[in-house]
């Protein structure tokens, strides 16, 4: 129901798809959810809702993304359109994938555009969306858009495995992990690559399912066990450990906080 209301202009829950550039970010995560749960989330939607999503996603081509992780927001939306059988923009997909490949700096890390930033955007965006966009191409067979061999996907997958090993080692026995960089209000979203690796059965041999499950459970229990990160109405607070509005970024809003659900 929430998916349908988000694109229904008559609903109070209709998202502001056609204003500013930020909706491209929101759309990318909606599209990512459809890619991950295509049969469970996209296929059951009624035809009108599907048409509305395709229209809103297509209209977001008005947004010119900067040469940062934003390129993957455009690419993820377009890859979903491709998977759904709608017309996709090949240039927005290919240029993003090539640019991200150029941004790999080694040992499981990508820079966020021309300059390296010590934050968790490798978790929030770069690893998951890059791998999943490459996967769409790999699974779509031969195409006339980009000669992207299967090794591109395999290489990106191995990089994410290395990054997942680093994330797992960040986690202390008490369930704490280092806090650094912007957007830290996304909390457990920092562990998205580790969760994705486990869910897809892609964990490297150095990490067992039980090991990752125990580590992530410890983090979640520490983060949410005593409800300090929820307000009186049950919504997430603006902060990392309780209500800490001062650590938020200028672009952070209450909806942003639910990036925590990525893990």
Stretch-by-stretch model annotation:
Residues 1-160, 168-195:
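Aromatic-lined, polymer-binding surfaces characteristic
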Residues 97-98, 160-161, 225-231:
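Short, functional N-terminal and low-complexity linear motifs
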Residues 164:
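Glycine-rich phosphate/ribose-binding loops and adjacent secondary-structure elements
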Residues 196-263:
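Extended polysaccharide-engagement surfaces of secreted carbohydrate-active enzymes
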């Amino acid at each position: 129901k929430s998916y349908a209301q988000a694109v229904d202009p008559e609903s109070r829950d209709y998202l502001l798809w056609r204003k500013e550039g930020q909706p491209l970010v929101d759309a990318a995560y909606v599209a990512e959810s459809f890619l991950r749960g295509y049969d469970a989330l996209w296929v059951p939607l009624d035809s009108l809702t599907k048409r509305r999503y395709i229209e809103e996603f297509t209209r977001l081509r008005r947004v010119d993304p900067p040469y940062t992780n934003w390129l993957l927001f455009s690419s993820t939306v377009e890859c979903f359109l491709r998977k759904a059988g709608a017309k996709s923009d090949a240039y927005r997909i290919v240029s993003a994938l090539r640019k991200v490949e150029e941004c790999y700096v080694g040992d499981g890390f990508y820079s966020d555009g021309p300059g390296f930033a010590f934050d968790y955007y490798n978790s929030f965006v770069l690893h998951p969306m890059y791998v999943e966009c490459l996967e769409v191409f790999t699974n779509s067979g031969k195409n006339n858009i980009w000669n992207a061999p299967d090794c591109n996907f395999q290489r990106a997958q191995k990089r994410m495995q290395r990054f997942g090993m680093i994330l797992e080692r960040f986690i202390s026995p008490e369930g704490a992990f280092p806090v650094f960089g912007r957007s830290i209000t996304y909390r457990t979203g920092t562990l998205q690559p580790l969760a994705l690796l486990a869910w897809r059965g892609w964990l490297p041999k150095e990490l067992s399912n039980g090991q990752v499950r125990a580590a992530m459970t410890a983090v979640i229990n520490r983060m949410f066990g005593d409800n300090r990160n929820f307000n009186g109405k049950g919504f997430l607070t603006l902060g990392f450990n309780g209500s800490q509005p001062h650590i938020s970024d200028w672009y952070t809003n209450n909806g942003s906080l639910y990036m925590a659900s990525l893990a």
